């Protein structure tokens, strides 16, 4: 049974040490499912928990407050979709000004290493994080080597299988 938590400090030991898929996962579309699916393969292969980490509210609410709220999927519906993807923990981190002020390095150390004790981290091709969006795949790759966790960046998925939309359109994976 999937658990839903809002704070990384509250993650119980039995859900630490797993594989963490990170993204906004707004809509949980094909690109998002690819990120979570990749993370799920690592988790199943190693017998560790699968965590899907998202941010609530969506960071755009904080950074672009004058625009209409950006939400493709209400929180409860997103949680139900996560449960359907065999996620053990849906960690919907409370995103506010204090959290947004964390540097990318602090996010890696405090959230991924100390809080979740992540064994492996999976993101989409366009995931950025930390104050000023300073963290990216390069930083995660370096941090993984230093801290001892694995890292996978899922490439962009292109729409070329006859589905609606223009051939070659990219499915957003984490934004």
Stretch-by-stretch model annotation:
Residues 1-175:
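Nucleotidyltransferase catalytic core that binds NTPs
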């Amino acid at each position: 049974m999937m658990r839903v938590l809002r704070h990384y400090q509250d993650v119980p030991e039995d859900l630490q040490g797993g594989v963490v898929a990170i993204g906004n996962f707004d809509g949980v579309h094909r690109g998002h499912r690819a990120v979570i699916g990749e993370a799920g393969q690592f988790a199943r292969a190693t017998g560790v928990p699968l965590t899907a980490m998202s941010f609530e509210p969506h960071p755009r609410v904080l950074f672009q407050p004058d625009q209409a709220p950006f939400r493709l999927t209400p929180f409860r519906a997103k949680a139900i979709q996560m449960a359907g993807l065999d996620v053990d923990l849906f960690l919907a981190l409370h995103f506010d000004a204090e959290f947004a002020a964390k540097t990318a390095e602090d996010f890696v150390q405090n959230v991924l290493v100390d809080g979740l004790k992540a064994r492996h981290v999976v993101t989409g091709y366009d995931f950025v994080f930390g104050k000023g969006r300073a963290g990216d795949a390069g930083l995660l790759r370096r941090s993984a080597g230093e801290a001892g966790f694995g890292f996978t960046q899922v490439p962009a998925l292109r729409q070329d299988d006859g589905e609606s939309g223009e051939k070659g359109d990219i499915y957003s994976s984490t934004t």
